[in-house]
Structure formats: C-alpha cells, structure tokens
C-alpha cells in the first residue's frame, strides 16, 4: 500500500473495522490528515471532513490537492453548501486542464483524470470533454484502481447498460489483490442496483448483504 496517493484511505488495504487504526498508521502527517477527512466523510461527519479538506485546497502536491477537492465537493453537498461545492469542482477542472496540457508525471495525470471522473460521474455531470478514464486507470494504485472500476460501472449504469456495469464490478472484485473495504462497499452496492434493474431480486439482496457485512464491521 502506498499512502502517498489520492484518497489514501480508499487506497488502503485493511480488514473491515480497522479504518481508524489504519488512519493512525499513516506516517506522513498531511496524507494522514486527508485519510482522517475520508474517515470523517464515510462515517457521516461531513463538517469535520470539510474543515480538514479546506486546508489542502491550494496544496502544491496534486494528490493532496485533488483529494481535498473531492472531499470538499462532497462534504459541502452533504452540508447543503452548493456554492462551496462548485468551488471544489472548479479547482478539479482547472487542475485537470493543467495536467492535460503539461503533465507533471503519468501518475499525476492519471490521478487528475480519476478526480475529474469521480467529481462528475457521481454527480451525473457530463464527462464528454474529459480524457478516457479507462486509458489511465491502469496507472492508478490498486485501491484507487478498484474504486475507478466503480466509477466506470456507474457510468455504464447511468446509460442503462446494467449488464456491462455488473460485469465491470464482478471482474474488479474477482481480480482485486487485497481487501479494500470502501471500494468493495461501493462495488457491492452497484451490483445490487444492477441486479434490481435486471429483475434479479435475490441476487440484489445478496449483494446488499455483502456490502452491509463489510460496512458494519
């Protein structure tokens, strides 16, 4: 596991129930703070998440910046602060444009593309002008690559391509190299949504229970 990446807690491999301990184990203080903000967001503490995220919006480290922008976008949406959320979206778009024109590294460009999709697809915004995320996903670290599979599946789901979305999720889970609880919860939930639309109610229920068992621990 590399802690020096975008959304380090999502990227972290750990057993369900060990999120707080995982955050405490990060050695770099800044990435630990971002991981703590992720923990706050995923445990329903949007205000606490927002306080941390805001401090890193202008970071010169693209991984810290994109992490903070994403957390800022979604925590502010949760808090009903639309204007602040739009500010985070603009920061992501501007950073992606810079990396597209003058990439600092292949990894940083991939991180920027991923952030662009994560901030757009999950809000049902257009991705027509973004680079193809599937071309960059291979450069992402394992835990983020798994979450990118969820984002790609979500795109297919929004197009009504339920079978394709289901296949993406199942393949991602099959070939994962470790336990990544956050990504796995999202993937199982997407599987449940696809199975519901495919009229497979029992399979949808089974997928939801898998997500629940990961989350409740």
Regions found by a protein language model. Name each.
Residues 140-145, 150, 156-186:
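A compositional/structural signature marking long, glycine- and acidic/polar-rich segments
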Residues 1-18, 164, 179-180, 188, ...:
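C-terminal non-catalytic interaction modules
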Residues 172-173, 192, 204:
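Domain-scale selection of a single, long terminal region
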Residues 2-15, 30-45, 66-82, 107-125, ...:
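Tandem amphipathic alpha-helical repeat scaffolds
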């Amino acid at each position: 596991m590399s802690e020096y990446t975008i959304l380090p807690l999502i990227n972290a491999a750990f057993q369900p129930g060990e999120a707080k301990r995982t955050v405490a184990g990060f050695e770099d203080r800044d990435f630990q703070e971002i991981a703590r903000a992720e923990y706050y967001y995923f445990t329903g503490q949007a205000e606490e998440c927002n306080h941390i995220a805001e401090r890193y919006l202008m970071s010169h480290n693209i991984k810290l910046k994109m992490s903070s922008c994403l957390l800022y976008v979604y925590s502010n949406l949760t808090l009903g602060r639309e204007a602040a959320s739009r500010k985070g979206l603009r920061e992501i778009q501007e950073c992606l444009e810079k990396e597209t024109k003058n990439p600092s590294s292949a990894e940083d460009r991939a991180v920027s593309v991923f952030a662009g999709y994560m901030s757009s697809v999950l809000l049902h915004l257009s991705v027509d002008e973004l680079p193809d995320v599937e071309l960059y996903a291979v450069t992402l670290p394992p835990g983020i690559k798994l979450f990118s599979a969820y984002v790609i599946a979500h795109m297919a789901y929004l197009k009504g391509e339920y079978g394709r979305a289901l296949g993406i999720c199942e393949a991602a889970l099959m070939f994962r190299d470790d336990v990544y609880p956050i990504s796995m919860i999202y993937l199982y939930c997407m599987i449940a949504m696809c199975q519901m639309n495919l009229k497979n109610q029992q399979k949808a229920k089974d997928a939801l229970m898998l997500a629940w068992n990961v989350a409740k621990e």
